[in-house]
Every structure is written in C-alpha cells, then in structure tokens.
C-alpha cells in the first residue's frame, strides 16, 4: 500500500527549507499564551533587526533539519514552535526574545548558532554579549586611551613654565 504525500505538506517542507537556506542562526521559541498583537510585535521587532519569524509544524521542521544534516534540535520541537532566523547579528535578535520574556508568556527553547546547539541558558548568556558596533566602540576606546593620556601629558609639560 503506497502512502500518499499531502501536497500541502510538501509545499510547507519546501517553504521551510527555503526559509532556512543560508542561515547560520536558528532559534526556537514557545509562543503559547501570546496574543496575536504580541506575536505581531515580536515578528516586527525581529524583522527590524534583519531577522525572520515563522510558526512551524514540528514534524515538518524535524524533516527539514534532517534534510540539512542539522542534529540535536528535536528536543526544542515540542509544543507550539516559532522559528526565528537571524541574517546578521544573532545576539541582537536573542536580546529581543529576552525583552519579550520579561513582559509576556514567550519562552525561549533553544537554538542553533554558527553550527552549535545552544540551550536556553547558553542563549541567555549569548544575548548579553555586546553587539558588533558596541564591541568596535569598546575596542576603539581601548586604543584611544593611551594616545589621550600621552596628549594630556604633553599638554601638561607645555604648560609648565621654565
């Protein structure tokens, strides 16, 4: 007996596979209890930071991950699941989740960041890292400090009257 494949499920599989193509950062959220307005606001905030959010069927997501040879994420695919991908700075997207966790029923399940499985606690720590811009700014201030000190010293020397 041949098992017929539902064309809608094939379409969902292909759509989800395309959604994940070229993405190194994938996050899994439990959106249970969120209102439509809260989920829409979350989606909007994620899109503002060059990310994308999609509510998925867990079994189809498992098949897509298997097709992409990504393992270790099945435990995050239980219950209502929203998948978020990040195109640029993944920790900025993670910060958004934890802002929402404070005020809504959103739960962060885990993720896949640059080829490594992150559980909720690891993602929480990751979200607290400085952004790329903040890191560059900090680095520049570290480089600038000795030069500023030298300039102040030379200025003080020139102010001394002999």
UniProtKB/Swiss-Prot annotation:
GO terms for cellular component: large ribosomal subunit. One of its GO terms (biological process) is translation. GO terms for molecular function: large ribosomal subunit rRNA binding; structural constituent of ribosome. The keyword Ribosomal protein applies. InterPro entries: Ribosomal_uL10, Ribosomal_uL10-like_sf, Ribosomal_uL10_bac, Ribosomal_uL10_bac_type, Ribosomal_uL10_CS_bac. Keywords: Ribonucleoprotein, Ribosomal protein, RNA-binding, rRNA-binding. Belongs to the universal ribosomal protein uL10 family. Forms part of the ribosomal stalk, playing a central role in the interaction of the ribosome with GTP-bound translation factors. Part of the ribosomal stalk of the 50S ribosomal subunit. The N-terminus interacts with L11 and the large rRNA to form the base of the stalk. The C-terminus forms an elongated spine to which L12 dimers bind in a sequential fashion forming a multimeric L10(L12)X complex. NCBIfam families: PRK00099.1-1 (NF000955). This is Large ribosomal subunit protein uL10. It comes from Borrelia recurrentis (strain A1). The gene is rplJ.
